[in-house]
Amino acid sequence: MAQELDFETKVFEKEIIEVAGTKEAIVRGGRHLLPLLPEALQGVSTIGVIGWGSQGPAQAQNLRDSLAGTDITVKVGLRAGSASVASAREAGFNEEDGTLGDMFDIVRESDFAIVLISDAAMAEHYEEIFAALKPGATLGLSHGFLLGHLDNEGATFPENVNVVAVCPKGMGPSVRALYVQGAEVNGAGINASFAIQQDVDGRATDHALAWSVALGSPYTFQTTMQSEYRSDIFGERGILLGAVHGLVESLYRHFREEGAAPEDAFRRSAESITGPISKTISHHGIIGVFEQLDAAGKEIFNRAYDVTYLPMKAVLQEIYDEVRSGNEIRSVVVAGSRLERYPMPTIDQTEMWHVGETVRAARVEEEIPLDPFTAGAYCATMMAQIDVLDEAGHPLSEIVNESVIEATDSLNPYMHARGIAYMVDNCSVTARLGSRKWAPRFDYAMVQESFPALDAAESETKASSSFVGHRIHDVLDKVGQLRPSVDIFVAS
């Protein structure tokens, strides 16, 4: 059963929505709310954004732009000798006016310290960060990873600070891109979840909501920090990055083995997912993909769905169990030191991705096929992820954002523009590690289980029989009304 959470805000308008019989409290965003930010950020004169990885540049610039004309200053803190100093200067932060400095100095100066360094760096430096926090300050995180690490270590947050999370449901570049591209469209941006881990002065909720509104979130929904990190780490290893990578690699080879030309195999696999399938899901839900097909196409969709759902769900359940147990967090922490000796290799060197460069160069968007087999396999994997999260009791908004909206509105457009590496490697180190680790498992599941099952007269399971009536379609219909008000544009 999905969690039902509620909160109180002194500044913003809370709205109760009902999705599939479950009530959720949300706040709709929009630039008309920006004048409320100083009131919501009561007690805050300096916001420090620590780190300049995937989320740092987007969040620092969005916060600065949203707070322009107020008495609240946004500063960026980076480690000594950081290679990102030049990029931060180019974005308008500099030492001369005090908006760029050493990370620990900026933490000490901040009333609201938003720490966006890599998870491995967080695990290494959290004690120094905690020591630098002002008593009564608000510590902001965009990922609950640190809570999981503290639990593993038997440690806790300092008792004299607020601890909140605002977690955009998309990679950092898309958080900035939709904010800029939607400058004239009220509410454009990336949806976000928020969580309150500690509230020492009664201001934590409004601080978190103000942060989310300032980032441009069309709507902000509540979760817990534990639920967030479990769904987030799981999701990026699943359909958001790892699963879709493994799936398209296996589909490409499958179509080639059936006799398809390289370009056609790429169009039917990767292009079909990042083009018409993603666009249809974004605007009409997962069920919309099925409804677009003719009778023959629906039969192929169902066949692909039936042979894909259980093998992919088994891998997804294993990932969720590894995250819940703390093992996946430990793996990321250990990888932090290993990466200095063994940097992550590229992931776009197979035939498929070289063919993709040629296909994209000659692409006619309207001619990309919605392949029914690919659609069935992709939707089955997405639904399997939804079911794993639902069975674990996650909030419904969190489920659809981590499994559907983030995929179609934030991540897949980057693969569509420039290929798999451009999508995966614009994400956090934790996401990049997880995608590389688990993508081969999804590929293996398709090759060893799903494709051989096609030769059987009938699938042993009829997973597709529960697809059309699944309650997630009603949830997506409701939540889809709150989607970003513009479609992201990613230059190829």
List PLM regions with ranges.
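Rossmann-fold dinucleotide-binding core
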Residues: 141-237, 295-296, 325, 336-367
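Glycine/serine-rich phosphate-binding loop and adjoining beta1-alpha1 elements at the start
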Residues: 1-46, 78-79, 196-198, 213-222
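Rossmann-like NAD(P)-binding element
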Residues: 3-6, 79-80, 89-148, 156-174, ...
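NAD(P)-dependent Rossmann-like dehydrogenase/reductase catalytic/cofactor-binding core
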Residues: 2-31, 188, 249, 257-492
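Small-residue helix-packing motif on alpha-helices
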Residues: 74, 85, 106, 122, ...
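NAD(P)-binding Rossmann-fold cofactor-contacting core
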Residues: 16-17, 64-93
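Glycine-rich adenosine-cofactor-binding loop
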Residues: 44-63, 363, 382
